[in-house]
């Protein structure tokens, strides 16, 4: 059996090869770079066909009392910015770890574009990304189907492109000024091929379901405006939020984390979003700090990028769903999964926000399982027996098989490792984070308990979002 890392790389290469084959096919048939937009009526029909779930009634509001954390007071009506800085933050500069760099290399929500898409100054004050429209005729896409962004181009007869925000696996994201409303929006431009188009329609369908259930926009999912076609690309318009939690961590809590009150505020809003997702029967499937945006005052959080989201009934078993550091154990093991995978991702994200460190920085799925058992103890035999990928990581006696790669012999090494009790549990790790007041110490104890419940190895025992919202961690002291 090959190392997980090489297996994952091979899968990624195969996907890239398939994408190139699809693009070549469309170039040959003349569909790959068509300047003709799909009519809006046809687009709506396509979205309706993709939707597999009937509209649901609005989600009932969470009942809170005066003793709960004052989200509204610290929310959009506040005139002051949230102080997210950890009072124990060191002033000394630090270097980003290699695992953090690797995880954000090709992420559209990282703090800056990857080196391959960064703009360069020409010396004349004009970005090299600005191109002549005459040069772009019949050549609007690159070889992989990404739209070639043109600054000051008009989209859908109303949006003026202001800047290129970044590029991900499925799309390019730009900021654009809406002339009709004199307001800036983020526009997600899906890659030009049939597979990406259908995935984009699926995302539109899910976004519309979520908005139908949250008409007042209080459940902390990114606000979706509308969609349209441009040069054969599906485009989705979203509210503009310029910062994500990765940015916040780098700026205010690099390697030391944020203040526990900031973590508490963000955590409550995360679980509000999870509650909406669960009631709509939607799995986000890619929750991480990069995919949680905040406003300028840093007191409102919204979960974004539902490109990997799906209906809970479509949970196909695959070992590489969700970004690796935030990947729940049931995904790696091939155990039936549902909405609790998002709760696991939130737990990992909250630990990272408070400590400034990635909780499970495994470079392979096998390493991820080892780190999880060091933190939470061994998996139950009952859970392992129901896992499709059991033999990839455990022997016949349910002993974990640690897989490493010998750099000298270039061979895979395998050795059994027995786990019983946790050796690096959540509580012992968080105790290393200093507290400045008795109040902060008490709140930290409650955070420990909440994280333990979010990170249950068995998803059936993991805390549901509606229960998490009532946890003592959110009771105002």
UniProtKB/Swiss-Prot annotation:
The modification Phosphotyrosine is found at residue 320. The active site is at 286 (proton acceptor). Residues 74-86, 113-123 have a biased composition (Polar residues). Residues 159-477 form the Protein kinase domain. Keywords: ATP-binding, Kinase, mRNA processing, mRNA splicing, Nucleotide-binding, Phosphoprotein, Serine/threonine-protein kinase, Transferase. Residues 87-98 have a biased composition (Low complexity). The modification Phosphoserine is found at residue 92. It catalyses: L-seryl-[protein] + ATP = O-phospho-L-seryl-[protein] + ADP + H(+); L-threonyl-[protein] + ATP = O-phospho-L-threonyl-[protein] + ADP + H(+). Residues 25-123 are annotated as: Disordered. Belongs to the protein kinase superfamily. CMGC Ser/Thr protein kinase family. PANTHER family: DUAL SPECIFICITY PROTEIN KINASE, SERINE_THREONINE-PROTEIN KINASE PRP4 HOMOLOG. This is Serine/threonine-protein kinase prp4.
